[in-house]
Amino acid sequence: MNDTIAAKLGIGNDTVYATVGAPADFAQWLGDAGDAIRQHHLMPPLDVVLVFLADPSRIAAGWAEWSDAADPAGAVWLVADKDSRDALLPAVRKASGGKWADDKFIATQGGQVAVRFVKQKDTRPPWKR
């Protein structure tokens, strides 16, 4: 499981996650996620919210819902075409009022990247700092 996309995204045993805009072949794309629980709604608190973006301009409209689902200590992963990566950072900064920051990115499949956003350290719960 260590080299699957699931492992790289931190999705594994005991992880509760949800997806937005996942492709039809999502299970194959993700790989072995162990005993992770996939919710089909964005009811918080989620450990991981995985958002597939065809267009980074959707960030402004969806950010509040996605980040609320991951609050207080989860992560929002945005999956987009690698050429869109530079557009993700300022869009999230603006949509979150600077309260969320990127701290990791990975190459996935088909020329895509996934960028992880977490709350700024000083706004996280003490046990997650």
Question: What spans do the regions from the language model cover?
Answer:
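N-terminal, charge-rich interaction modules
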Residues: 1-31
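Catalytic cores of nucleic-acid ligases and guanylyltransferases
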Residues: 15, 20-23, 43-44, 52, ...
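Short, aromatic/basic amphipathic alpha-helical patches
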Residues: 26-33, 86-96
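Short acidic low-complexity segments
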Residues: 36-46
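Short, glycine-rich nucleotide/cofactor-binding loops
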Residues: 49-59
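Mid-chain, well-packed structural core segment of small domains
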Residues: 60-92
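Class I S-adenosyl-L-methionine
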Residues: 97-129
